[in-house]
Amino acid sequence: MPNHIVLYQPEIPANTGNISRTCAGTDTYLHLIRPLGFSTDDKMLKRAGLDYWDNVKLSYYDSLDEFFEKNAGGEFYYITKFGRHVYSDVDYSDPNKNYFFVFGKETTGLPDELLQANEENCLRIPMTDHIRSLNLSNTAAVLAYEALRQQSFGALLQEPNYDRKIFKD
């Protein structure tokens, strides 16, 4: 079963574009919950995602309720600096589960009510107190690759796939 990145009302097109590229490169599904803080025609969104958009498994939703209704049965983790558990302490290794990593708006995060109702599934990435938060696209990549690492990288190519040879065999 696949891994999923869920963006709740993302505001910065470059972040969403970068995340889409990570999703294309890791075979991770991308879910966007409206309203978005930008147009999907935004040049920053397109530039950050480069020409990989055709390889992104992308779904849109008009609300959190619609998202949860259409993805019932998944295992949901809410990524927040307030999480009581560290992301790397969770087991994502079961290939038969759908793991959903839910991220909030860049400026305000996820709704407090959602976090309070799911306290045990709220995860954080350790950081210093010198910053308010980590960048959304970097955080999404950390979670995507941690899940894939635990799944032995699934179907990803684990050998270089380029014609260019740098190292001697």
From Swiss-Prot:
Main location: cytoplasm
Transmembrane portions of the chain: none
Keyword annotations from UniProtKB, A to Z: Cytoplasm, Methyltransferase, S-adenosyl-L-methionine, Transferase, tRNA processing
Location in or out of the cell: Cytoplasm
Binding site for S-adenosyl-L-methionine: 79, 104, 125, 133
EC number(s) per entry: 2.1.1.207
Listed InterPro entries: Alpha/beta_knot_MTases (IPR029028), SpoU_MeTrfase (IPR001537), TrmL (IPR016914), tRNA_m1G_MTases_N (IPR029026)
GO CC terms: cytoplasm
Keyword Methyltransferase carried by entry: yes
GO molecular function, one term: RNA binding
SUPFAM superfamilies: alpha/beta knot
Alphabetical GO biological process terms: wobble position ribose methylation
Reaction equation(s) it catalyzes: cytidine(34) in tRNA + S-adenosyl-L-methionine = 2'-O-methylcytidine(34) in tRNA + S-adenosyl-L-homocysteine + H(+); 5-carboxymethylaminomethyluridine(34) in tRNA(Leu) + S-adenosyl-L-methionine = 5-carboxymethylaminomethyl-2'-O-methyluridine(34) in tRNA(Leu) + S-adenosyl-L-homocysteine + H(+)
Summary of the function given for this chain in its UniProt record: Could methylate the ribose at the nucleotide 34 wobble position in tRNA.
Family named by the database record: Belongs to the class IV-like SAM-binding methyltransferase superfamily. RNA methyltransferase TrmH family. TrmL subfamily.
PANTHER family assigned: TRNA (CYTIDINE(34)-2'-O)-METHYLTRANSFERASE
Name the UniProt record assigns to this protein: Putative tRNA (cytidine(34)-2'-O)-methyltransferase
Lineage: Bacteria, Bacillati, Bacillota, Bacilli, Bacillales
